[in-house]
């Protein structure tokens, strides 16, 4: 027997089932194996002997809850496990005790036998027989436990000193007591376990659990009824086997066993069934939106989740789906999408508006720069040209007149360049406004040819041919059409040394290719400018051009332009539109083919040699092309070098509708009175004749266009229509031989006496000056009348012109008109004063608007010539004060309060009693160097009657006074 002891595992914690004092005496003798971890079950099974207090309400609350039910079920299972485990452990302990008892008895028997053997064999060898070997071996034959593996290979070794009978007797008694205590404890545990099981069965909350389930089911139904959904199950044939329908339209018995086709009809049913079939075929769930429109519940949108249902074998046996009504959400979603689209559109519009505003600001700055340039150049140029005209009326020798002629021509060239640049800038920036008026194409062609003939120095024939299908009157922008014709005729005359120059006007049978009229609007594919032409036209009658505005409330209407209230660029369905084709041809030097592509570009000419030899700025044709495209037409050229050129443009024009009450020719508005034979003539020819003598004027013909009172054209006096030869060597040959010579046209110009040869010639010179001045803005020719008429003696004096100015003066001083000149520039004051004095009128001069108001308060005037830009108070503000007083009889202090102290007071009212008494409207004529039409519109809006652009000449002043002054 060895001294080794069994090693006790450190990680094993076991509670001994033996009494606590069992090892006190023999702790030093034996090292016994501790029981396994299964012994913990016995410890867990201990119950308190003392009853404890229980909160029954809390217990019932926990038992009635879902968690309590779960815990109760777990508790029952746990106690069943504990009971089984305890019984097993007790059986194991009892078996072990029995085995140990048997070993003790065997040991006891061995001891007795050994004692007897020793007595019998005193002299024999004593063998030591281990008394516990069989017991130890039998010990490990018992059923093994899970915690007994630690002691399988260990042997119990007992010291020899403890191998005595008394020890084992005592040991056996202790084991007996321990076994009895264990059995008693087992019986106690069994009793308590049975008691707990009985208590658990008697207190099982079956009714509470049933109530909980009912409440949960009710709550589930309540949730489903509150949610707008449909839950259903369909079999493989898509027949309903279960459905919970939120919508009370159908009962369950109306749905169960039927398909969707048997229940509903309308939009969306077939689509949903196809998706269900796809889910069953693919075995994959899906979510879709379906739009239904059925007679049962109307238009609805559902979002549906569909999933397949599988059997145990994996076959698809149906589908489950959940559908929710999202009609309101879809409506809100569409509204939100619409709002987002609107916001995007609004943002794009704001961006575009910002860009347009930026472009507009840039355009306005450029336009303001051009206006400033025009004003700054025109102001000193006005002094030069006006003083030159005044100087031409004085006594000068031949050389002085020639120098003066060069001065006037050069000044006119500078003025023409300014006008071309301004016209081009207005067209390109979109500021050019086209205004529709009713005019007569024949008169326009005839007047253009007359003006060209008046300034012609070459042996050329000017001819015009008007087609029979051309209407007598059409509606269009007559000023721009005349500007285009004049520019083309001027170029033709300039580049033609011999032969003829002519205009051919006719109506096209078909409209221009690439252009169409849809919805009353003109469209052009070839040009982008005509498409926007309607935006540049005004519905108001023409009141002004680039230089002069006329008041529409005067009876002196234009002879060839009749105001119209229709927009030029807008053609209504009932309007008749004709396409006029105008060909301007010549037999001149022609244009090289390589130069044709560059012909209509700005500042470009056929060649540098042409530019040096013939002059010009290269802007005329560019302006013509843009004006034609702006009016919705096209401009083309056909030319062959050394054979001539033909410029052709096509324009849409509307035929004016005659009113029923205007059948009488006398009531119909006309530019020259009633229709005559000359109004419908089809051709004009201006042929050169012998040069009788020279007549010079010293006054430039090609000056800026000056239109007073809306007179866009001036019909020349009868000297141009009576087949009598002109003094400049040209005669008008007409196709009609009757009634043309006797027809007399009324005009705003001075009457011509046919009995006085000198007056006849002088009147013709002035008339040609007037005609030429009106088209100078569209031409580059700066030739004056003094260079048009030749004499056999060569250049001579201009005493006839001077005598004409002297005769035009008002001889009786008592009939002088009282004129107020409001001007701050000393040079302009000198010019206007000199011209008015030569015309025989008195003049008062003030330097700003405030002084003008003081002068009007003290004296009555027949006409006021007022500058626009002046210090202290400009002409526009002063005009508003004057018009306000004329309308109300008192000075309106609300127009500009800061000037109240100057125009208020009782003295002022008494001083102006003459104006209030007569109720007279004093004509106010604007005089400014700003040639933009917006400036003219501002003048008219302020109350001015007309507009004269600087530089001012005798003809402007004279026409203005003739129109607005009362007859002397």
UniProtKB/Swiss-Prot annotation:
GO terms, biological process = cytokinin-activated signaling pathway; phosphorelay signal transduction system
| Polar residues composition bias: residue spans | 738-754
The residues forming a coiled coil are 89-120, 169-204
Where are the Phosphohistidine residues found in this chain?
Answer: 375
EC code(s) of this entry: 2.7.13.3
* Upper taxonomic lineage: Eukaryota, Viridiplantae, Streptophyta, Embryophyta, Tracheophyta
What is the reported phenotype of gene knockout? Dwarf, chlorina and sterility phenotypes.
Q: What is the protein's given name?
A: Probable histidine kinase 1
